[in-house]
């Protein structure tokens, strides 16, 4: 049995409703801080079970052009790393479940323990760390244990059996399965590597598996929800963000319907 995490009850609730969890990502501070907070609380009302609050970073090597451009806009408009705690608090106050998604450098510069402490105080439940591997995560593992935060590492189709098992063993809450190789972004077709990757995870653990990188419609959400515990949507929501809260809510509701009809 996997060690239960803060997000375990969210996935348990979704399983009880015989559906996958909907996990929505938006970059903090895009297009500006106040608007991003409004958009993320809109995701809660639109049916997202977990909100990923992205920290804008100047070298987003794993992001597609849509998210990279949004991060650039957020940074140009003055968003700071510490602003993420304000956003997480707003999501929590709206009844949502918030995790942070960040490259490791901003957290490292802030101070790993200080970041974890403030995130927990704001109601945050964990951090997704796309460019951090468990072998190099001693400080984060210690801080997450100290402040009761979930650790979400990434696995990919290219992960060796040993790497997969080690990564899953270090996760708490859920594991992020990257369904396509390379950078993220909305695609017309969802990778057929994803079901095989989810099966590999389930061979070694009962931890919840969230699949991301490519979903942009309710139909695609339903496709992934048929075999995954969580459906992660990022670029499509970022694309809707400039159109305002109504557009973001409409897409969230479509996706929420999708994860319920798998």
Swiss-Prot record:
| Annotated catalysed reactions | (1S,2R)-1-C-(indol-3-yl)glycerol 3-phosphate + L-serine = D-glyceraldehyde 3-phosphate + L-tryptophan + H2O
Its domain of life reads Bacteria
Its annotated pathway? Amino-acid biosynthesis; L-tryptophan biosynthesis; L-tryptophan from chorismate: step 5/5
Which Pfam families does this one have? Trp_syntA
Which Gene3D superfamilies does this entry report, sorted A to Z?
Aldolase class I (3.20.20.70)
Q: What class of enzyme is it?
A: lyase
Single GO cellular component annotation? Answer: cytosol
Q: By its UniProt entry, which InterPro entries does this protein fall under?
A: Aldolase_TIM, RibuloseP-bd_barrel, Trp_synthase_alpha_AS, Trp_synthase_suA
Q: Which UniProt keywords apply?
A: Amino-acid biosynthesis, Aromatic amino acid biosynthesis, Lyase, Tryptophan biosynthesis
Give the residues annotated as active site: 52 (proton acceptor), 63 (proton acceptor)
Q: Cite the GO molecular-function annotations of the record.
A: tryptophan synthase activity
Protein family: Belongs to the TrpA family.
Which function does this protein serve?
Answer: The alpha subunit is responsible for the aldol cleavage of indoleglycerol phosphate to indole and glyceraldehyde 3-phosphate.
Q: How does the annotation summarize its subunit structure?
A: Tetramer of two alpha and two beta chains.
Q: What is this protein called?
A: Tryptophan synthase alpha chain
Source organism per UniProt = Mycobacteroides abscessus (strain ATCC 19977 / DSM 44196 / CCUG 20993 / CIP 104536 / JCM 13569 / NCTC 13031 / TMC 1543 / L948) (Mycobacterium abscessus)
> What is the name of the gene encoding this protein?
trpA
């Amino acid at each position: 049995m996997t060690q239960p995490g803060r997000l375990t009850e969210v996935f348990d609730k979704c399983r009880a409703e015989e559906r996958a969890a909907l996990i929505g990502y938006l970059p903090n501070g895009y297009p500006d801080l106040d608007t991003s907070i409004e958009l993320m609380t809109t995701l809660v009302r639109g049916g997202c079970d977990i909100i990923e609050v992205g920290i804008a970073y100047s070298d987003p090597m794993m992001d597609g052009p849509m998210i990279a451009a949004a991060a650039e806009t957020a940074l140009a408009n003055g968003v700071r790393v510490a602003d993420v705690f304000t956003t997480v608090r707003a999501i929590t106050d709206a009844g949502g479940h918030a995790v942070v998604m960040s490259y490791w450098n901003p957290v490292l510069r802030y101070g790993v323990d200080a970041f974890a402490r403030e995130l927990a105080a704001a109601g945050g439940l964990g951090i997704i760390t796309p460019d951090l591997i468990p072998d190099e995560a001693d400080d984060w593992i210690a801080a997450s244990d100290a402040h009761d935060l979930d650790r979400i590492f990434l696995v990919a189709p290219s992960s060796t059996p040993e790497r997969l098992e080690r990564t899953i063993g270090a996760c708490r809450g859920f594991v992020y399965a990257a369904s396509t190789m390379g950078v993220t972004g909305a695609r017309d077709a969802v990778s057929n590597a994803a079901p095989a990757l989810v099966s590999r995870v389930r061979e070694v653990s009962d931890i919840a598996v969230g699949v991301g990188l490519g979903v942009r419609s309710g139909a695609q959400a339903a496709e992934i929800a048929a075999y995954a515990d969580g459906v992660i949507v990022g670029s499509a929501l970022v694309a809707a963000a400039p159109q305002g809260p109504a557009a973001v809510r409409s897409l969230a509701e479509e996706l929420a319907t999708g994860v319920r009809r798998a």
